[in-house]
Curated annotation (Swiss-Prot):
Interacts with protein M1. May interact with host nucleoporin RAB/HRB and exportin XPO1/CRM1. It comes from Influenza A virus (strain A/Chicken/Hong Kong/220/1997 H5N1 genotype Gs/Gd). It comes from the Viruses. One of its GO terms (cellular component) is host cell nucleus. This is Nuclear export protein. It is found in: Virion; Host nucleus. InterPro entries: Flu_NS2 (IPR000968). Keywords: Host nucleus, Host-virus interaction, Transport, Virion. The gene is NS. SUPFAM superfamilies: Nonstructural protein ns2, Nep, M1-binding domain (SSF101156). Mediates the nuclear export of encapsidated genomic RNAs (ribonucleoproteins, RNPs). Acts as an adapter between viral RNPs complexes and the nuclear export machinery of the cell. Possesses no intrinsic RNA-binding activity, but includes a C-terminal M1-binding domain. This domain is believed to allow recognition of RNPs bound to the protein M1. Belongs to the influenza viruses NEP family. A motif (Nuclear export signal) lies at residues 12-21, 85-94. One of its GO terms (biological process) is exit of virus from host cell nucleus through nuclear pore.
Amino acid sequence: MNSNTVSSFQDILKRMSKMQLGSSSEDLNGIITQFESLKLYRDSLGEAVMRMGDLYSLQNRNGKWREQLSQKFEEIRWLIEEVRHRLRITENSFEQITFMQALQLLLEVEQEIRTFSFQLI
């Protein structure tokens, strides 16, 4: 994974955790959990691309893999909509910056996952 992407994930997760601690009225657990899950999935997909010699095992689980990929794209779309919604309703500049960066990262990761998946197909 690109080191900028790793630091972006870590930075955004840290910021969202601070926002969660500062605001008991807004529950960010779901978004934080989804971000962590997306990071792990993106990492594992990148590793699979780098291990192209493992193509036989990938072909054996290809049906399940495609289903998981579809599910991840649904999760990304949900996260994008949730982040956009929170961006519209917040007036706090720290939160606005965090959600803008999160939105940018989600769009980048979506593109990376698409690129990886095309390499694996």
